[in-house]
């Protein structure tokens, strides 16, 4: 059985936690239609490295955790998420992988501090929802990476439609190109591209960078 670690005391739920308490039930059934590039990112990571210790920040329902376990059968995987409801889904989804998977209920506002570090830190459609906080998350990821380790990101990038940007803001997403400059400055880019979704309604970013 996989492990869930939770702090002994918790503050009141945030707006984001309340948002995902309901969305956890429908997340996997709906997000395929607009969270593009997730499977492709895992495939590309596998062409660059063979990580044995991996961390996903904002692991949600565990879709990527299960994918990492299948692609890297010798690896140990840790997932961190602020939503108990999403972690409950992730626990069911990753049970077949047993003790290889550890789930942690916490914010990622400071490094986990594992002495061995991680070969890969993955952020999949998470950083754009950390507002404020994505800068802090990137600093924590850099500290948690082992020497030579990589940060892998797929996320919303930008849109030229103000109405769509405002709507995404209602759903806690910031998408005004804020992530790419920080990623390029903080990590050595190995993959760094922006692609259009739905004919250019918005763009999404795929980035893999090595720890400097």
Label the predicted regions.
Residues 111-121:
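A short acidic, Gly/Pro-enriched loop at the edge of an enzyme's catalytic core
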Residues 188, 194-212:
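Core SAM-dependent methyltransferase catalytic element
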């Amino acid at each position: 059985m996989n492990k869930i670690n939770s702090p002994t005391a918790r503050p009141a739920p945030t707006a984001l936690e309340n948002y995902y308490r309901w969305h956890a039930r429908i997340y996997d059934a709906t997000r395929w239609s607009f969270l593009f590039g997730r499977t492709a990112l895992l495939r590309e990571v596998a062409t660059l490295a063979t990580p044995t210790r991996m961390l996903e920040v904002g692991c949600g329902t565990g879709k990527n955790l299960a994918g990492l376990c299948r692609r890297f059968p010798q690896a140990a995987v840790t997932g961190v998420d602020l939503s108990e409801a999403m972690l409950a889904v992730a626990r069911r989804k990753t049970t077949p992988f047993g003790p290889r998977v550890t789930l942690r209920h916490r914010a990622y506002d400071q490094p986990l501090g594992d002495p061995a570090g991680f070969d890969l830190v993955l952020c999949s459609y998470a950083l754009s929802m950390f507002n404020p906080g994505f800068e802090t998350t990137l600093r924590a990821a850099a500290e948690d990476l082992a020497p030579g380790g990589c940060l892998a990101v797929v996320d919303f990038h930008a849109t030229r439609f103000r109405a769509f940007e405002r709507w995404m803001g209602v759903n806690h997403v910031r998408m005004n190109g804020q992530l790419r400059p920080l990623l390029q400055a903080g990590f050595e880019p190995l993959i760094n591209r922006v692609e259009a979704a739905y004919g250019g309604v918005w763009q999404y970013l795929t980035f893999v960078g090595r720890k400097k």
